[in-house]
Amino acid sequence: MAKKFEIVSQYEPAGDQPVAITQLVEGLEDGEAFQTLLGVTGSGKTFTMANVIAKVQRPTIILAHNKTLAAQLYGEMKSFFPHNAVEYFVSYYDYYQPEAYVPASDTYIAKDSSVNEQIEQLRLSATKALMERKDVVLIATVSAIYGLGDPDQYLKMILQLRLGDTISQRDILQQLTTMQYTRNDVELWRGCFRVRGDVIDVFPAEAEEYAVRIELFDDEVDSLAWFDPLTGEVLTRPTRITVYPKSHYVTPKERVLQTIEQVKVELVSRLEELRSLNKLVEAQRLEERTRLDIEMMSELGYCSGIENYSRYLSGRASGEPPPTLLDYLPKNALMFIDESHVTIPQIGGMYKGDRSRKENLVTFGFRLPSAMDNRPMRFDEFEKIMPQTIFVSATPGKYEAEHESKIVEQVVRPTGLLDPVLEVRPALTQVDDLLGEIRLRVEKEERVLVTTLTKRMAENLTEYLEEHNVRVRYLHSDIDTVERIEIIRDLRLGEFDVLVGINLLREGLDIPEVSLVAILDADKEGFLRSDRSLIQTIGRAARNVAGKAILYADKITKSMQKAIDETERRRAKQIQHNTEQGITPQKLNKKITDILEDSPYAPKPGASAAKLKAAEADGEYSPQEMQRMTPAQLASEIKRMEKQMYQAAKDLDFELAAKLRDDLKRLKSSMVGVGDLR
């Protein structure tokens, strides 16, 4: 019997949430293709989404525009649905340099990348959940529109065994090898298998803490078990098991052989074309590179850059969209697009950037024309397969306005907090005036966010404030995601009082201690001072009872007026609701550790208190130390500790092994958001 979504929370919907939930559910039941949840900052949009999911009982995908927000959503949804499958699907690259050619300098750049094994495991776990369960909430980034293995081919590669099945050990081992599992009779790692007599142990690629044991008697499956690979303890003895491939990109051998023949035909045609244009260097280059790929595929079943032949491997015609994560979704799936005013343009922009790079590779003989079909989805292709969709944003964009059937407002916060008080002050004296406002906030132990137009202005302002003994930090684009989280955490802890930034102080920044947002040069029309940008930035002060936003400007622009009018409209509605209900705005008491704990690797609900205590009391690294480590240091330390853990298990020191496992979980939590933000 399929599990149902069961929401777990100490809170009941409040403020505008009950009405918003009812209206959204009614819209879904009426078959509305698109709806918009216009939810202000701090109104509990994630809680509303969770309640809608629980009401409609449908598998759901939530798209976010970067890994940091995806990790926050994952943490929140995991706490709301501890008994259901909450999964995480983002780019698994810590570092990614795509293949490229620069004609101006005749420079070829080979593809270079570093894969995060923990995130790869979570991606495999996500697709497995979609295939096996209906109670799935999947948090994903724009990585969802990039090519993934064809779901039909992927399903064909699955190994399914039942008690009493007749199958030889040789056939099982051959199938595991075809699924890209590696034999390792010494140590059982994720994605490996070992053989001991008639017993085959497999550590599934998507699993985190369990492995499969297959015992044969002659050519019959005599026993099946799930066991702990660390301790060897048998957890359950099912009557059947399913082992999924190690990669989404595994392909049956027949399909690879078919691909080789198709590549040969295209190569002959393309070489004739290049030679007819007298492009002899390009023709020679293409022939050498492609013949090498063909030889590798013939011998090994794959080659470096095999994704460039994905059109043939997936059996698509020229120009057809690639198979993506969205092809794995059930037909009755529901989609939320979080911060849709940012996420939708991001989805639309991926195809164009990828195409311009590929055109150079094809034109200059580095790739066959079919490589153009190894690409992210175009936006029109994405639209065609979108399930019923709810856009979620405080400032919906043009696309949402054109496609929504109805707007559901969530303006009143459950806490009774109001949108900040707005003031417009002259830009001529903005720096000195700001300094005075900062001093007032520092006396009250409150924090300040300041947003400028350019990097140089931000640097100069930071220097000026430092000279006047203000504890200030500067947040800029060169700072990676983990360090950014650390800076925000230090701001909340009071390590410094003022944070200066450019375009980084908008969506998803949750700092209840901030009582003042200052927007310098607010009257300079443009992307950073559009009405949506202004509303989002003003919203950063909406989580504080004394929230205030100051716009420094010499004139009021159309964008400013729109932002002021919308903020005042929302504030009036909030005041009216509080007066009618007798509500006094409540200060938010969000734990400072929350921003670091909201991670796909946090200890699972229900983990024993003893294990958690061991991790907290005896962990080798404090949270601060972990956050200061570079991605390379983290990866190295994780590998070292994994070796220690398995060695401890070998030595039968299970207490030490369990402690190391818990310490590893804490270290892995620091890996979220590192690197590529797809």
UniProtKB/Swiss-Prot annotation:
Residues 597-630 are annotated as: Disordered. One of its GO terms (molecular function) is ATP hydrolysis activity. A motif (Beta-hairpin) lies at residues 92-115. Keywords: ATP-binding, Cytoplasm, DNA damage, DNA excision, DNA repair, Excision nuclease, Helicase, Hydrolase, Nucleotide-binding, SOS response. Pfam families: Helicase_C, ResIII, UVR, UvrB, UvrB_inter. The keyword Repeat does not apply. Residues 635-670 form the UVR domain. It comes from the Bacteria. One of its GO terms (biological process) is SOS response. PROSITE patterns: HELICASE_ATP_BIND_1 (PS51192), HELICASE_CTER (PS51194), UVR (PS50151). Residues 430-596 form the Helicase C-terminal domain. ATP binds at G39, V40, T41, G42, S43, G44, K45, T46. InterPro entries: Helicase/UvrB_N, Helicase_ATP-bd, Helicase_C-like, P-loop_NTPase, UVR_dom, UVR_dom_sf, UvrB, UvrB_inter. One of its GO terms (cellular component) is cytoplasm. NCBIfam families: PRK05298.1, uvrb. The UvrABC repair system catalyzes the recognition and processing of DNA lesions. A damage recognition complex composed of 2 UvrA and 2 UvrB subunits scans DNA for abnormalities. Upon binding of the UvrA(2)B(2) complex to a putative damaged site, the DNA wraps around one UvrB monomer. DNA wrap is dependent on ATP binding by UvrB and probably causes local melting of the DNA helix, facilitating insertion of UvrB beta-hairpin between the DNA strands. Then UvrB probes one DNA strand for the presence of a lesion. Forms a heterotetramer with UvrA during the search for lesions. Interacts with UvrC in an incision complex. Belongs to the UvrB family. PANTHER family: UVRABC SYSTEM PROTEIN B (PTHR24029:SF0). The beta-hairpin motif is involved in DNA binding. This is UvrABC system protein B. The gene is uvrB.
